[in-house]
């Protein structure tokens, strides 16, 4: 399971700066939920081969009213659900009463905590950081988040216990493409392995869109899973099931009750739990409330699923009982706001009455099969060549970008690796054209497809061309002819 790193500290110690650096963007919102957390941010980060979820919990002032009352409920939940806490302090401002209050709270929770002294640029870092040892939380790690100093070392150290689980051997910071090409036998064996595994299905959506109702509808009336027992709040519930001879694992993030009790409880909603479920799933089923239309929360969750490369099916719930005018408006909004995911199937259902629920699994299987389908190197190369025939790559410095061959780079999501010369200079518009061309040609449905470009080495680069004997004779005759003309 992907680890969660929570950034904790009083205001203005650099949490947002570190968040933006880890997520590599200044607009790295994955899910920002008004009404649940006023200023919390969730992002997906990659650093030194590690993949993790990072949470900016917002500032805590630690006033006399007490740390428990000043820390928002969702910030408390973020700390409780985090695997690692980075307790950020300001080396320039020194140790404050708020820092002491936060440290006391973290000690009581017995979380894996690392003290980070930020803003060490331009000062005597060792002297400035010395007083933070008195917090009693172990070693103090020096960092200048704005400049990136100490960030990589900090994350590597904090996430080392998760390296084996993530299959990490020391890698560089940049993600590398696996250039290994499967043989036909290996590719067939890998596809069979994937097809034999249960499909892990994450049912996600904002609160009260009907996730629990749908899960109970899928599992049947008698299935009961109590979601508020000790130990069930941190991780999602994994429920195995079988349908039409196909095995599934339903990843439930809402907590499941008897259908008769669904309306009697307020759904517990955990953003982190939802994001972790997306990372662990093969297929994501996003539930949208037809009565409310597409909300920003829906787009945030959708963005996270797409960034994770997960196969996707969308279900518009509560479709029964609304008039035709509202249905037309919702369909128009779906076309307008979700046009960029035209590869995903959209279903209109009623989880309460079961209308349309059975058809969801046709699209779920279709999306998973598309995401794990094996395509040979010869087929991918042929499609690549056809795309060039229909629309040539652009000229770069007077030379045409040359694409040589393509092969599969991974499954779920499907990854196509394209080798060629000057591919790094291909404009984004041409890359999008190729991605859409591959999608249409392969009839990929319900899953994003990724293209990766590898620069091919030119074997003649920096080498003097060696002429054949006939070429050498022609060259001498040409030079002799030029000399004769100059002497006349």
From Swiss-Prot:
The keyword GTP-binding applies. Residues 373-457 form the KH-like domain. GTP 2 binds at residues 205-212, 252-256, 317-320. One of its GO terms (molecular function) is GTP binding. InterPro entries: G_ENGA, GTP-bd, GTPase_Der, KH_dom-like, KH_dom-like_a/b, P-loop_NTPase, Small_GTP-bd. GTP 1 binds at residues 9-16, 56-60, 118-121. It comes from the Bacteria. SUPFAM superfamilies: P-loop containing nucleoside triphosphate hydrolases. One of its GO terms (biological process) is ribosome biogenesis. Residues 3-166, 199-372 form the EngA-type G domain. Keywords: GTP-binding, Nucleotide-binding, Repeat, Ribosome biogenesis. Associates with the 50S ribosomal subunit. HAMAP family: GTPase_Der. GTPase that plays an essential role in the late steps of ribosome biogenesis. Belongs to the TRAFAC class TrmE-Era-EngA-EngB-Septin-like GTPase superfamily. EngA (Der) GTPase family. This is GTPase Der. The lineage of its organism: Bacteria, Pseudomonadati, Pseudomonadota, Gammaproteobacteria, Alteromonadales. The gene is der.
